[in-house]
């Protein structure tokens, strides 16, 4: 699901309009053991691994299968179909998310720097927001 970055005049909503701007991040030193602990939370579906602000991998549960607890996770994840651009057309991306059965996509700027996370609500109706994530974390007594 790789996307060409938008080069035309803006017509409708783009990914940046609805993305979570403050997603949880992991560094390249994050281990499989740590990742498994993070992913034990049923609201965490993917780990965004960055180095100096640049997205280097998106890691999902299935990427960790068979990996040793001390292994770094960034080597196990991938980008490609797990990433969209900030200026990508939201309607196109939303349709592709439905077709591919994806609820989470990392969002990067033109330089590959992480800009946020596009997160479809469990209901499939709309996208998660920073306020919604913060409220859920506060209600569960967990830090964001």
Regions found by a protein language model. Give the residues of each.
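Tandem CBS (Cystathionine beta-synthase) repeat/Bateman regulatory domains
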Residues: 1-144
